[in-house]
Amino acid sequence: MILFTAIILVASVVHVVVSSPQQCYYCVEDDCETMSLWINQTCATSQRSLGTSHCGTAAVRYHEGYLGGVPLETTVKGCFDCTDKSAACFALAGLLKSSLGWVVQQCDINCCNDTNCNTNVTILSQNATNVLRRDAFGTTSCYECEESDNYTCILKQQSQTCRTSRAALGITHCSSAKVKTRNVLTGTVDVSFIRGCISCEDKKSACALLAGSFKFRKHATMLECDIECCNGSYCNDGAASLSKCFHCMEDDGLSCSARQQRQICSLDPESLGTTHCGSAVGRKRNQNGAIQNYFYRGCFDCSKKKEACFTLGGYWKGDVNAPGATTLLECELQCCDPNVINGSYCNVETPILKPAAITVFTPTVTGPAQCNVCLEKDETSCSENQQTQVCGIDPYSLGTTHCGSAVGRYRQSNGDMVYGFYRGCINCADKMAACAAVGGFRKNVQKWTQLQCEIECCTEDNCNTHTPRLVEVEQPNSAPRGEIHQLFRCTFVAVFIVFACFIVC
C-alpha cells in the first residue's frame, strides 16, 4: 500500500510528462506585487519548479522557523502540478522549508494550464490547506540521514532536533523513506534512503514534502516514494534490531567513556565482530618504542578472548596512515552479549590489567630475521612478486617468531566474496590467534571481513614458501553488508596497500 501511495505521487505531485504550460510566471514575497518583477520559470528544468502541468498562484501563511515570532503572509507564483491542490501545497512547503527555512502553516492555491496564465491574485480562504503546524504535539527528535543505500544511511544516521533543524520537514513524526528521483538537467535516475523529522498525517502529503525539498536541494523530480512514519522520539532508528556497542580508543577508561560513540556491529567498517561488545585494557608500544597504556571499547567476536585480542592487535597494525604507531603488547578483555534483551551498549565495564593478561605481539622473542612477503590474489602471483620483510623492524610485521603463508576467503564491503594470498612475518604459535591478527589487519586497511583461511608457518629465514589450500566451504556469491560472519578456521589475511609500502621500505 505504501508503494501505491508512491505511484499516485508520480502523477499528483511531480508530473513529468511535458505539457502545456511550458513556462509560468515566478515570484516570491514582495516581487509578486509588481508584475514587472515576475520572471519566466521553465517548468521542466527550473530548480524551483514543482510541476509541468499547471501554473499557479499560492497564498501562504508561514513562520520563519518553528521558534519564530508572529506569522507572516505572502504570495508565491510558479510551475505546479495542481491535480491535487493539497499535495501541491505540501510540495511548496517542502521547497520553502529547504530553501528559506519557512514553516508554512496554511496554503491556498489557484491554478491554470496555459503558458504564463498565473496572473491572478490568491488569498487565504477558510478552506486553506493546513500544512506544518507549530503547535502540534509529537516527536522531539528523530534519526536523520540521506544516502544512496540503506546500510550507509543507518551507519551514518545522526540525531535531528525537529523544531530547530533546517532540514526537518515537520514535528509530528519520524520517517524512513526510499525515494526514486530524476535529475531535471541530466536525466539521471537515482535512489535515495532518507530518515528525519516530518509531518506525516498521511503518507501522500509526507511524500509531497519530500518532493518539494528534493526539487530544491537536488534539482530532482521525485518519481516514487515509499515511506514509513512513527511518532515517538528516535522511533525511525534503522539499527533498532541490530547489535550496537560503545566504541572508543583512549589512554584510560574515563577518557574513553567521555568520548565514546555508537558502533553498529554488522555495518561499521571498523567493527571487529558481531557477537559481543567488549572493553579492553592493556599496554602498547608506539613507533618510538615508548610503552603506553590504552583503553578500547567496541564490537568483537569474543567466543575466544585470545583471538579477540589478536584481532585488535592486527587492526592497529594495519593503520596505513600511521605505520607502526600501535603495537599491542598485552590485552585484558571483558565481553558481553548485545543480542540479549536490552543488551546493546552493554560494554560499560572497566577491566583491570592483570599479570596473566593475554600477550599479543612479542617483539623481543627471537625467530627468523626475515621472511618472504607478498600480497596477491593467488600463490603464483605471490611467488612472482614477493619481497623480503625484516620481522623486527618492519612497521607492518605481525610478529617475530615465525614466517607464514596464508590463503583466505573474504567478504568485501560491498558483499562480494574474494580470495587472497599472503606471505610475511607472524606470531604463529597459535594459528587461530595468528589468523585473527591478520583478519583485524585487513579489516583496517581494506574493510574486508575474514571468512576462512589456512596458514602454514615455519621458523627459518625466508622459509615461507608453502602453498596452503582452503578446505572448501559452501559460500554464497555475495551477502548483504548487514551480515558479517567469522569462520575462524586458521584464518590469515593481509593487504595490497601494505605490500606497496613493503616495496618502498
Swiss-Prot record:
It is found in: Membrane. Component of the acid-insoluble and acid-soluble organic matrix of the aragonitic skeleton (at protein level). The keyword Signal applies. Residues 20-483 are extracellular. The chain crosses the membrane at residues 484-504. Residues 1-19 form the signal peptide. It comes from the Eukaryota. GO terms for cellular component: membrane. It is a single-pass membrane protein. Its main location: membrane. The keyword Transmembrane applies. Residues 505 are cytoplasmic. Keywords: Membrane, Signal, Transmembrane, Transmembrane helix. This is Uncharacterized skeletal organic matrix protein 2. It comes from Acropora millepora.
